[in-house]
Curated annotation (Swiss-Prot):
InterPro entries per UniProt: Kinase-like_dom_sf, NEK_Ser/Thr_kinase_NIMA, Prot_kinase_dom, Protein_kinase_ATP_BS, Ser/Thr_kinase_AS
UniProt name for this protein: Probable serine/threonine-protein kinase nek3
Catalytic activity field: L-seryl-[protein] + ATP = O-phospho-L-seryl-[protein] + ADP + H(+); L-threonyl-[protein] + ATP = O-phospho-L-threonyl-[protein] + ADP + H(+)
Domain Protein kinase: 4-264
Biased composition annotated in UniProt, kind: Polar residues: 440-459, 654-665
Organism field: Dictyostelium discoideum (Social amoeba)
GO molecular function: ATP binding; protein serine kinase activity; protein serine/threonine kinase activity
Residue numbers annotated as active site: 130 (proton acceptor)
Compositionally biased intervals (Low complexity): 283-307, 327-415, 478-529, 557-576, 588-617, 642-653, 666-696, 712-738, 752-802, 908-935
Pfam families in alphabetical order: Pkinase
Key words, A-Z: ATP-binding, Kinase, Nucleotide-binding, Serine/threonine-protein kinase, Transferase
Family listed: Belongs to the protein kinase superfamily. NEK Ser/Thr protein kinase family. NIMA subfamily.
Binding site for ATP: 10-18, 33
Gene name as annotated: nek3
Length: 1123
């Protein structure tokens, strides 16, 4: 570093910076790259060293030169050549700001030098892999531009001629398709793609492939789509770019093929001058102007003064000369553009560009007094025309009294008489080279001597108008006339309202309106007007025109039927047919609903809406319904609906009777049961006396004498004197008239058992509808529920056994209630009192004879669900209906004995366990006043047996009190069932045995549970041992993995130090120094001093002044010793 003087930092990267330095020995400017290799990963460190090795191998005039490299303080320093003119990317940015493109000469001069550099590295099997404009540097040497290819940081040396690389690197704008796909690898053709992108960017100043995001950019590259190249470049250059940007690498040319092209080979060795030093000469050379200039240009330049306007005129002559050159090649488009840029006073009233060019040429003839006309008019093809212009408009050329000074203003000073000031003539002329029709050779009509005559600008030549009108389409601008009704955006002929067979449309493009009394929509309309969509319309203004579409009529009818099914408005039962009326917003103001003879809307009867009604039961008819003349809709079961009734006509097929019940709980705790039944006799109606008025509103004009009850057996219908109902039967009533019964009852809680009851009872409902019916036959079974004395029961139609089973709800009983009840039974048995005078048990009765009764044990052992109903049942008195006499005394006695034994057993267990948790049992039991006598006969026996039981089981009870476990309900239930069987067979004697067996089973279960707890504890201890072992194993694995991680770090550091030291000392000296330091093995203090001194002498001879880097070698040896 002492040999170089740092000037400034010219670039920074992630691991270092580029510094401009000056060599102190000769003052040469160089670039010093400082790279911190100690902070790099091994891959990045190898890339840095790779660049050093590559630069040291390369020596070419178009590649950045390599001078030296060294490592200092953990940083790698590379000394390389300095490119004093920046890079190509900087030049492209300058041209973009100046809005100037590169000439083809500049592009190909640079491109040939880049190809030479690529040819050189390809010959050494080196891929650059990051070829872009930022890595192509410019250097000015002896006043000429030279290309310098640099930045070989990610270059790769191929091992053989046919090897392929497989790493995706480089800038995304210049990536080749094979690099993106990374499937088959890539070779030198990938650098050709990047070179094509660079060449495209030189021609257009833009990237060939550019997008807003990376996926879009990748898609464009894979498709190979790029904007076209400007047309002012040669076809050879455009074809070359196209061949280099081929998707298939095999179709791309090699570097040798490109350099062998004739138009590329001619630029090899030609120096390129800097752009800022002599831009004008450079442009003249690039356009080859000197070869095309004539002697007349020299004579014309003598008359131009050396003012500031002369420079402007000179720059303006450059595109004129280019236009002359292009005109010789039959390119008239560029000629017209250049002439338009040179003239400032052209007349733009005419739309033909050729006439403007001719006007500009004539203005130049009137303004300038120049000998050579070719300097201002370069498109003439006839020499005779030029001579006539000279004789008529230009004075003698060599007269010293006639100088002209050309300025950028609109006025020119001409040599004229003092009294006359010439004006600019804006006369359009047409030359034979631009207009195909021949013209006269006189260039200006009406002017012969411009120096003596004054010509006004209003004089125009009418000759060129004829050929223009015949060749070019004109725009006719007419005065605004009376507006006509036409179709917007239509090029057809306008149709006047006089013709009645066509439709004159208004400016609204989507609606076709008709003119009243003048025109109508018909099939013979004009072809210029599109036919309207096929709709049924009429031409009379009073009718509906196009609001109702025949396609939408079924949908409208369905919509009307759905609306009519939920409406509650009343209508007459004999109402007429009413068709579908379209919605008001789709109708015109004058439209009325009319019948459609081809597609009439269906009748909105009660049977037409049956498929759409939400029926939740199986009470629908299987036969197709008949249509009636009334309109309405049938409601579903259990919901309010509107229906019509016609006594004389059968609406539904009554061949199949159906019945359904829906249980709907309400907010107040009541339930709504809705049943429906149909019978064969549809005309049987029952008239009742109206003692209780229904709360259903009766609309005026509706009959209220028809009953809604149609039962399966007409003879079984009976009514009570206190509970009647009156339901209207009009077409808009809220109760369906299709033979369905809708009852709403108030039930405090569902029944838990069922029994038969044939007696009739008068009952009233508590719901607002107050509909109640009674039945005296077996077909109407009663659901009797135990309720308080303040509530009444309600009757419904008979149901099947499956519905009754679903309605049974278990009752939850608390432990306090069980304790009080068992204690009462115990006291009654011991003291001898009657059970009926002490117990308060809710008896639930009773199943109908037609339904199979449930088993006794399943009723008693039913799981509880509600505590509120149980408390009500335990506090109220026993309620029995008049139908309990159907139960036999034997069944009641057996049932009571079973219940008594079960409760006695539960009482003993409850007293012994003293458990706080509630014991699950069933509160559903049946009692009767007739069963008290049988229990009283055995009270003395039960008292003696109970005393003996207490003495014999005292020890068992004490053991149960000590135990903390609670017996399972399943064990209690199983022991209860055994106690019931023993009690039924042997009376009170078997009760003792059942209690003893139940106590022993409880003890056995307790022992089993203790054993299970011990086993669970043992399993938990085993699991803890396993968990501890797993934790130890995990810690051991973590320590091992940590040691492996440390070894891995030591390995990576040792490899980095070995590579670093090898690059510093060289491979041979590194091995010798490494072996020398590693062989050092101190034994004693004296020997250690002698060894160190001898080793230092040897090291100084081996490495010389690089002894500073021995510390890195020592670190390497230390890392290897720790691994």
């Amino acid at each position: 570093m002492d040999k170089y003087e740092e000037i400034k930092t010219i670039g920074k990267g992630s691991f270092g910076r580029a510094i401009l330095v000056k060599r102190k020995s000769d003052g040469l400017l160089l670039v010093l790259k400082e790279i911190n290799v100690m902070e790099m990963q091994p891959k990045e460190r190898s890339d840095a060293m790779n660049e050093v090795n590559l630069l040291s191998m390369l020596d070419h005039e178009n590649i950045i030169g390599y001078y030296d490299s060294f490592i200092l303080n953990g940083c790698l320093y590379i000394i390389m050549e300095y490119a004093n003119a920046g890079d190509i990317n900087l030049e492209i940015k300058k041209r973009t700001l100046q809005n100037k493109t590169f000439s083809e000469f500049e592009i190909l001069s640079w491109f040939s030098q880049i190809c030479k550099a690529l040819q050189y590295i390809s010959s050494r099997n080196i891929l650059h892999r990051d070829l872009k404009t930022q890595n192509i540097f410019l250097s000015i040497v002896n006043g000429d531009y030279f290309i310098k290819l640099g930045d070989f940081g990610i270059a790769k040396i191929l091992n053989s001629e046919t090897s392929l690389a497989s790493t995706v690197l480089g800038t995304p704008y210049y990536l080749s398709p094979e690099l993106i796909q990374n499937e088959k690898g890539y070779d030198h053709k990938s650098d050709i793609w990047s070179l094509g992108c660079v060449l495209y960017e030189l021609t257009t100043l833009k990237h060939a492939f550019n997008a807003a995001n990376l996926p879009a950019l990748v898609l464009k590259i894979l498709k190979g789509t790029y904007p076209p190249i400007p047309s002012h470049y040669s076809n050879d250059l455009r074809n070359l770019i196209s061949s280099m940007l081929q998707i298939d690498p095999k179709n791309r040319p090699s570097v040798n093929d490109i350099l062998e092209l004739p138009f590329i080979n001619q630029y090899l060795g030609i120096p390129l001058k800097p752009f800022d030093s002599n831009l004008n000469e450079n442009n003249n050379d690039s356009l080859n102007i000197s070869n095309n200039s004539s002697g007349s240009n020299n004579s014309a330049s003598n008359n131009i003064s050396s003012s500031t306007e002369v420079k402007d005129q000179k720059f303006q002559n450059i595109p004129l000369a280019m236009a002359r050159n292009i005109n010789n090649n039959n390119n008239n488009n560029n000629n017209n553009n250049n002439n338009n840029n040179n003239n400032n006073n052209n007349n733009n009233n005419n739309n033909n560009n050729n006439n403007n060019n001719n006007n500009n040429n004539n203005n130049n003839n009137n303004k300038s007094n120049v000998d050579d006309v070719n300097s201002s008019s370069t498109t003439t093809t006839s020499s005779s025309i030029v001579k006539s212009k000279v004789n008529t408009t230009v004075s003698p050329p060599l007269s010293p009294k006639k100088p002209i000074t050309t300025t950028t203003t609109k006025t020119t000073s001409l040599k004229t008489t003092p009294s006359i000031k010439p004006t600019l003539v804006k006369t359009p002329t047409i030359k034979s080279s631009l207009v195909k029709t021949p013209l006269s050779k006189t260039p200006i009509s009406g002017t012969k001597n411009p120096t003596t005559s004054k010509i006004t600008p209003s004089i125009k030549t009418p000759l060129p108008k004829a050929p223009i009108s015949s060749k070019t389409p004109t725009r006719l601008v007419s005065k605004p006339t009376t507006p006509k009704i036409t179709t917007p955006k239509s090029t057809s002929t306008m149709i006047t309202p006089k013709r009645t067979t066509t439709t004159t449309t208004t400016p609204t493009p989507t609606t076709a309106t008709t003119t009243p009394k003048k025109s109508s929509l018909s099939s013979s309309s004009s072809s210029s007007v599109k036919p309207p969509p096929p709709t049924t319309t009429t031409t009379t203004p009073s009718k509906d025109r196009s609001s109702v579409n025949t396609i939408n009529k079924p949908m409208a009818s369905n919509l009307s039927s759905q609306i009519s099914s939920s409406s509650s408005s009343s209508s007459s039962s004999n109402s007429q047919f009413r068709p579908t009326t379209p919605s008001k917003e789709r109708m015109s103001p004058t439209s009325t609903s009319t019948k459609s003879p081809t597609n009439p809307s269906p009748t909105l009867s009660s049977s037409s809406s049956l498929p759409k009604s939400s029926l939740k039961s199986d009470s629908l008819c299987t036969s197709p319904p008949r249509f009636s003349n009334t309109t309405g809709s049938s409601g579903g079961i259990g919901v309010s609906g509107n229906g019509n009734s016609n006594v004389n006509s059968t609406v539904l097929n009554r061949s199949v009777s159906s019945l359904s019940i829906q249980h709907k709980p309400t907010n107040s705790g009541s339930s709504s049961i809705s049943s429906s039944s149909s019978g064969n006799n549809s005309n049987s109606n029952t008239t009742t006396n109206n003692n209780t008025t229904s709360t259903t509103p009766i609309r005026p004009g509706l009959k209220s004498t028809k009953s809604m009850l149609e039962l399966s057996t007409p003879t079984s219908i009976s009514t009570s004197n206190k509970s009647t109902t009156t339901t209207p039967t009009s077409s808009r009533s809220n109760t369906p008239s299709t033979g369905r019964l809708s009852l709403t009852t108030s039930i405090p809680r569902p029944p838990s058992s069922n029994g038969s009851n044939t007696g009739s009872s008068s009952s009233t409902t508590t719901t607002p509808t107050k509909i109640s019916t009674t039945s005296s036959s077996s077909s109407l079974n009663k659901l009797t529920t135990p309720i308080k004395s303040s509530t009444t029961t309600s009757t419904t139609a008979s149901t099947n056994s499956q519905t009754i089973k679903k309605s049974i709800t278990p009752i939850k009983v608390t432990s306090q209630q069980v304790d009080s009840t068992i204690s009462n039974i115990k006291n009654n048995i011991v003291i001898g009192n009657s059970v009926s005078t002490k117990t308060n048990i809710s008896v639930i009765s009773h199943l109908s004879p037609s339904i199979k009764p449930l088993p006794t044990q399943s009723i008693i052992t039913q799981l509880p669900t509600s505590a509120s109903t149980a408390s009500t049942a335990s506090t109220t008195n026993t309620t029995l209906t008049s139908g309990t006499n159907t139960m036999t005394t034997k069944k009641r006695t057996d049932f009571k004995l079973d219940d008594l034994g079960h409760r006695s057993k539960l009482n003993s267990v409850k007293l012994s366990s003293k458990s706080s948790s509630p014991i699950k049992t069933s509160s559903s039991s049946s009692s009767s006043s007739s069963s008290s006598s049988s229990i009283t006969d055995k009270k003395s026996i039960n008292r003696v047996k109970l005393n003996n039981l207490k003495e014999k089981n005292k020890e068992i009870i004490n053991n149960i009190k000590i135990s903390s476990t609670i017996p399972k309900p399943s064990n209690i239930n199983s022991s209860s069932s055994s106690a019931f069987s023993d009690l039924n067979s042997s009376g009170s004697s078997s009760l003792n045995n059942s209690l003893t067996s139940s106590s022993s089973s409880i003890i056995t279960n307790q022992n089993n549970q203790n054993n299970q707890n011990n086993q669970n504890n043992q399993n938990n201890q085993n699991n803890l041992k396993i968990i501890n072992e797993l934790i130890l194993q995990n810690n051991l694995n973590n320590s091992i993995s940590k040691e492996n991680l440390d070894d891995k770090r030591l390995h990576s550091r040792a490899n980095a130090l070995r590579h670093f030291c090898s690059s510093i000392f060289g491979e041979d000296k590194f091995k010798e120094t490494y072996n020398l330091l590693k062989s050092q093995s101190p034994s004693t203090s004296n020997n250690e001093i002698v060894d160190i001194a001898s080793i230092e002498n040897q090291l100084s001879q081996l490495i010389g002044d690089k002894i500073y880097y021995l510390k890195y070698l020592q670190q390497l040896i230390y890392c290897e010793s720790q691994i």
